[in-house]
Swiss-Prot record:
One of the essential components for the initiation of protein synthesis. Stabilizes the binding of IF-2 and IF-3 on the 30S subunit to which N-formylmethionyl-tRNA(fMet) subsequently binds. Helps modulate mRNA selection, yielding the 30S pre-initiation complex (PIC). Upon addition of the 50S ribosomal subunit IF-1, IF-2 and IF-3 are released leaving the mature 70S translation initiation complex. GO terms for molecular function: ribosome binding; rRNA binding; translation initiation factor activity. Residues 1-72 form the S1-like domain. This is Translation initiation factor IF-1, chloroplastic. Its main location: plastid. Coiled coil: none annotated. Disulfide bonds: none annotated. The keyword RNA-binding applies.
């Protein structure tokens, strides 16, 4: 399947499930179980409940997704200036 055919939506992580799975509430209100993409797993990106993420869905199966990006929280202290 081409990358062009995939649907990108944003949502927030509501629950952490076993084996790198997460339950994500999408912006349209649906909840879908998702897994982490390979690049996120390889780079050890930490995803916690409450994080905003970008999810990729297949047009053939909208019941499962893949987390492809963790969005920065505006209130996080990732960038501390002195």
């Amino acid at each position: 399947m081409n990358k062009q055919n995939l649907i990108d939506v944003e949502g927030s992580v509501t629950e952490s499930l076993p084996n790198g799975m997460f339950r994500v509430r999408l912006d349209n209100g649906c909840q879908v179980p998702t897994h982490i993409s390979g690049k996120i797993r390889r780079n050890h990106v930490r995803i916690l409940p409450g994080d905003r993420v970008k999810v990729e869905l297949s047009p053939y199966d909208l019941t499962k997704g893949r987390i492809i990006y963790r969005l920065r929280n505006k209130s996080s202290n990732d960038w501390i200036t002195s």
